[in-house]
Amino acid sequence: LSGQPWQSHTAIHTLLTLGGEVGVTLFFLLSGYGIYLSLSSSEARGCLPGWRAFMKKRCIRIMPQYYVCITVLLIFMSTQMFSNEGLRHILAYYTFTENFSPVTHGSINGALWTMGVIFQFYLIAPFLYKAVRKNWLVSAIVSIVFTVICRFAVVRYLHNSGISDNSVYFVYERQVFSALDNFVLGMAAAAFWKQTGDR
């Protein structure tokens, strides 16, 4: 939203920003919900995938479209992106780590940081599934407490480091550990629905 004409209108800017936050939160919640149902369905058929099989399936599902999207974006970008510094950004996007640094976050596309977080969630999703399946309520509570602690620790560290740039806070509050509650709450909602629906 930076530099846009509506930025000077506080009410409009706040609504647009809030809408974006709500959209991202729903995206993560639905991702957790969908992953839980997918794994639960596989387990019901007696073929719950191991970590490698799960990641292989996820990669096949998201990587082709994701890489095509990045490649198309790069075709229309400045040739500076193909410098030594630019290659750092390209590598970060192709390895789903663009959200790790304020330098690469949003450098090719401002929305694709969510794919980095989603991919990192996939890396731990099979383990979270087992915890949520065992006790969805405890898992949800623990995830909320963990996320609050992580967010507080990040803000405190950045503040003590003398960093006042809001964009840096924006980036480091959008990591998988600071969005974990969204994913787990989505999984917990699916677990609750499955348990009540099976009665």
Sequence positions of predicted segments:
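Phosphate/oxyanion-binding loops and surfaces in catalytic or ligand/nucleic-acid-binding neighborhoods
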Residues: 1, 62, 74-78, 97, ...
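C-terminal TM-helix exit segments that contain a strictly Trp-centered aromatic cap at the helix terminus
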Residues: 72-81, 149-157
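Transmembrane alpha-helical segments and their boundary/interface "anchor" motifs
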Residues: 17-28, 38-77, 84-96, 119-122, ...
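Aromatic-enriched alpha-helical transmembrane segments of multi-pass intramembrane proteins
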Residues: 28, 47-50, 88-113, 127-199
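Short beta-strand segments in beta-sandwich/barrel cores
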Residues: 34-35
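Short, positively charged
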Residues: 2-8, 158-162
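Membrane-interface segments at the starts/ends of alpha-helical transmembrane spans
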Residues: 7-16, 164-171
